[in-house]
Amino acid sequence: MKSRIRFVLPFVLFGAGPAVARDNQEFPVQWKVGTTYVQSMDMAQEMTMPGGQGGMQTQMTMKVRAVPQKGSKEGTTEVTMTYDAADMTLKMGGNEVPGGGEALKALVGKHVTSVFNADGTIVEIKDMEELLGDDPMLARMMNEDSMKQMVSQASLMGKPDRPVSPGDSWTFSVEYPMPMMKLAMKGKYTYEKDELVEGVECARLVLDGQLTMETDAGDDKKESDDPQAAQQLEMLKSMGFKVSESAITGVMHYDFALANVIKTEMDMSLTMTMKDPSTQQAMTLPMKTKVSNTLKAQAEK
């Protein structure tokens, strides 16, 4: 019996057991001045094409270095986010598309500044023109609202409207006008439990939601500035493009000490429907996406 006690005691002393549950949490997201953050993102996406034409696979990786400083407006924090790495591989029917990742590679070394309010909600993106440069492909892929979406996906898309405890849930709803359509997400977070992640005490938050896209509510400014984008939008409308089914599930780990989300695993599945432009026959395009995000923090020396 004594040897068994000696074996168990170190685990108790050094906290190898489960984390103690915390009540009345609001999960504020903080970007602390004097800390440098490194965020890594990996995305894998696959779309199935009809009629045995082969599918489309996309692999994307990004690494962003984030340095916060006190904002110019009271109660805000401005976080300069520099792209240290960005790459994408695109395959059609199993064959790699040459130059598929060139637009993303052009981001390396560039930066944007994200402005957050006191509770960590992103309110503004600065320096978008510098980030996009004169690349029309990047301009069609990204704007301020889509950048807000990417930043939000790595954190909480909606915070609780009241203090919550393990077992509680809350809903969220967000909209992001994109260059050629409007993207909307709605869903529910559940504060499932507390657990240790690599020795760090975290809240495990479970996500369950849906995604919608509307081609009638795109970014009008982008359409007028980019004739090719406007032409592509009209083509989508004429094809009756819509999302008929969608599901988003995921798990996030919120670090209590850091006051930020340090790990995100998210799965998205969509079923898109449209008409074949040559035959006018209805097409169904299932698409699956897996996104992983990690956040590391290091105090400035």
Task: Describe each model-derived feature in a short phrase.
Residues 1-9:
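Bacterial N-terminal signal peptides that target proteins for export
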Residues 8-16:
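Bacterial N-terminal signal peptides
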Residues 17-21:
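Sec/Tat signal peptide C-region and signal peptidase I cleavage site
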Residues 22-301:
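Signature of exported/secreted
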